[in-house]
Amino acid sequence: MQLFSILSLLSSLMCSLTVLGSSASSYVKFPVQKFADIINIGTQDVSTVFKRNEVLNTTVINGIGVYVVKMEIGTPPQTVYLQLDTGSSDMIVNNADIAYCKSMSDGSDYASTDNYELTATFTGPRSTTTSPELITLSALIGVNSMQETHLLLRITRLSSMTYTY
């Protein structure tokens, strides 16, 4: 249910972006497919993705108390750092505006001209065992100086906390 809400919110944000565009060709379009319909994932066949005997070997970087994996996403490939949270099921691809990403930057001008930044925040329902979760979704869509389009999406989940001194 929560995933549906996030996807619905993302869809609304992307529709808002189309209104901000200056021409008919300045909108963002995402094809939606079932996982089984995707013919090729990188260089692997879909049938091998779910095999339990395969292991992903990658370098894990530890910095500022978090672990990240350096990945390439998109066409042309863009280097991003996937943040691993061993204490939850969340997976985060950091936004280029985060200080950690700037310190690991490869020199790409993600924060160039012609950017649109959309942010929405909502609070989940309170339960008897936990305080409400604050979920923030922000998307930065832009065109850099080489006319390459970038979409940087960040979903942040923060649980309310009480501090005692």
UniProtKB/Swiss-Prot annotation:
<dbReference type="GO" id="GO:0004190">
    <property type="term" value="F:aspartic-type endopeptidase activity"/>
</dbReference>
<dbReference type="InterPro" id="IPR033121">
    <property type="entry name" value="PEPTIDASE_A1"/>
</dbReference>
<keyword id="KW-0732">Signal</keyword>
<feature type="domain" description="Peptidase A1">
    <location>
        <begin position="67"/>
        <end position="165"/>
    </location>
</feature>
<feature type="signal peptide">
    <location>
        <begin position="1"/>
        <end position="24"/>
    </location>
</feature>
<dbReference type="Pfam" id="PF00026">
    <property type="entry name" value="Asp"/>
</dbReference>
<dbReference type="InterPro" id="IPR021109">
    <property type="entry name" value="Peptidase_aspartic_dom_sf"/>
</dbReference>
<comment type="similarity">
    <text>Belongs to the peptidase A1 family.</text>
</comment>
<keyword id="KW-0325">Glycoprotein</keyword>
<protein>
    <recommendedName>
        <fullName>Yapsin-5</fullName>
    </recommendedName>
</protein>
<feature type="glycosylation site" description="N-linked (GlcNAc...) asparagine">
    <location>
        <position position="57"/>
    </location>
</feature>
